[in-house]
Amino acid sequence: MPLKKPDPKKDAAKAAAAPEVPKEFTFDPKSVKIEFAAEQIEEFKEAFSLFDRTPTGAMQITYAQCGDVLRALGHNPTNAEVLKVLGKPKPEDLNTKMLDFETFLPILQHFTRNREQGTFEDFVEGLRVFDKEGNGLVMGAELRHVLVTLGEKMTESEVEQLMAGLEDANGCINYEAFVKHIMSG
């Protein structure tokens, strides 16, 4: 079988038919409208200053510290998300490039505005871990234990109020119904 010569017209048509790659998110701090109150900004400045290691107290942190400051202020961004808003710096620049408070504030506003709310599926998936029999039920006692000991811990009375009337005769809870109950307010 003889080899075919490549047809430039066909190759060009194939290339044109390829879907356009969506542009990657680029963060522009100047485009972010700051919506924090003056008192909040002062609190943020205070937290930011605790990470400032400059000898003169110049209100600067390294790029590597940005995620730590965000987490100290109650956010939970991944390292990838932090690197993305910092413009994907090279690893060797993380400990040398500096970020001042005026540049950090729009980054903080971005994470505050875009704080992810968990979806129904996220919560159900998280509770499915405790569904040992795969029947859509979790032990009420185990769920109580998790709610008072892990993450943002709840008090016993908060848990009782939350779970009131949801346990069946065997002490089990349908976790999909539980999530619907919570998300409905």
UniProtKB/Swiss-Prot annotation:
The source's superkingdom equals Eukaryota
Keywords, sorted A to Z: Motor protein, Muscle protein, Myosin, Repeat
Claim: Ribosomal protein is one of the keywords in the record: no
The UniProt annotation puts the region (Disordered) at 1-20
EF-hand domain boundaries: 39-76, 118-153, 153-185
> Transmembrane residues, as ranges?
none
Please tell me whether the keyword Repeat is annotated for this protein.
Answer: yes
Example GO molecular function term? calcium ion binding
PROSITE patterns, sorted: EF_HAND_2
* InterPro entries hit by this protein: CALM/Myosin/TropC-like, EF-hand-dom_pair, EF_hand_dom
Basic and acidic residues composition bias: residue spans? 1-13
GO BP terms, alphabetized:
cardiac muscle contraction
Q: Mention any one GO cellular component term assigned to this protein in its UniProt record.
A: A band
Complexes and interactors: Myosin is a hexamer of 2 heavy chains and 4 light chains.
Other notes on this protein?
Light chain 23 is expressed in chicken embryonic skeletal, cardiac, smooth muscles and in brain continuously from embryo to adult.
Q: What is this protein called?
A: Myosin light chain, embryonic
Protein's organism: Gallus gallus
The record lists the lineage as: Eukaryota, Metazoa, Chordata, Craniata, Vertebrata
